[in-house]
Amino acid sequence: MKIILIMGLPGAGKTTLANELAPMVNAKRLNADEVRKAANDWDFSEEGRKRQAKRMADFALKLKEEGNYVVADFICPTPEARSLFPADYIVWVDTIKEGRFDDTNKMFIKPDKFDFHVTSQDAKNLAPKIYELSLIHI
C-alpha cells in the first residue's frame, strides 16, 4: 500500500485531481482542509504547518497500515513540511503562479523532487495518466 501526495498552491486544483484519482486506485482520501477542521487548528504559521504535516502523516500512515492506498491533498509549502509527510509518490500541481493567500505565496518553495508535474487544470484527463504512471511506483 502506498501514499500519494498531491501538493501545490491553494486554488491550483489539488482537491479536484485527488477526487478524480482516489477512486482509480481505490484509495482513502485525506484532505488537509477537512483534517484541519476536525482538529480545529487554523494556525497557518510555519509551526502550524509543520504540525499539520505531522497530523496528515499520522493519518496517512494509519490508513496505510490498515492496508489502504492513500491519496492526500494539501499545500505542503516548504521542504521541511514535505519531509514530515511520508509520500511514496508526489504529484505537484503547478497550474497557478500565486494562490489566494499572500502568506502562503511567500512561504511556498517549489519542490525539488516530484514524480508527476501537473501544469494544466484538466483533472479528468490527467488522473488516468497519473494512475498509469503511479503503477510503476506503487
Model-inferred region functions:
Residues 72, 115-124:
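Phosphate-binding beta-loop-alpha motif at adenosine-nucleotide cofactor sites
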Residues 14:
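Conserved lysine of the Walker
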Residues 47-98:
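Glycine-rich phosphate-binding loop used to anchor ATP phosphates in small-molecule kinases
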Residues 136-138:
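Conserved small/polar residues in nucleotide/adenosyl-binding loops
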Residues 18-58:
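Conserved substrate/cofactor phosphate-moiety recognition/catalytic segment
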